[in-house]
Amino acid sequence: MKKQPIPYERSVTFGRFNIPHSGHVELVQMMLDHSEEAHVYVSDGASNNDWDLRVLLLAHLCRSANVDLNRVYFRKAKSPFISVEQTIESSPWQEAVIVLGSDQQDFARSLSNHFDCPVVINRRSNSSTQMRYFMDAEIFREDLTHLYNGDEWAITLAMILRKEERYREESCEASRKTGAVA
């Protein structure tokens, strides 16, 4: 008989979550599979989309996927090191498990070594790059609808976030060109 592992009190992740999608939802669920509470730190750096809109969409997608949001805490942070440190310090047992996506394996190892914490890697099932591609190429609207399970509200909010991101990218490029001319 296989024993279930005793979950950690807390799990922690850090990310931009600029355009939340199903892969992020799977990451949050994996956090809950390994801990009592999931502390999801969403970067509040200036180069990101609006924090409240990102969390609103991520929470909506989690709720739609029946993720237990009573155990999920969305927080702001400037860096992953601060995120992990705050989670560990506030934990009753001064421990946490770090959960990151497969594209962050080297960084996860670094955090693990620094804080002496275990790491769980969430395998990639979707990517922000893929989502941007489907949003930018309108001929893939059907694929985008499928990726958001036909949820028009989620698709609309994701498109707003993508437009915010593109506006920022275009503004930066225009500033670079202006700076190069001057």
Regions found by a protein language model. Give the residues of each.
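Nucleotidyltransferase catalytic core that binds NTPs
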Residues: 1-182
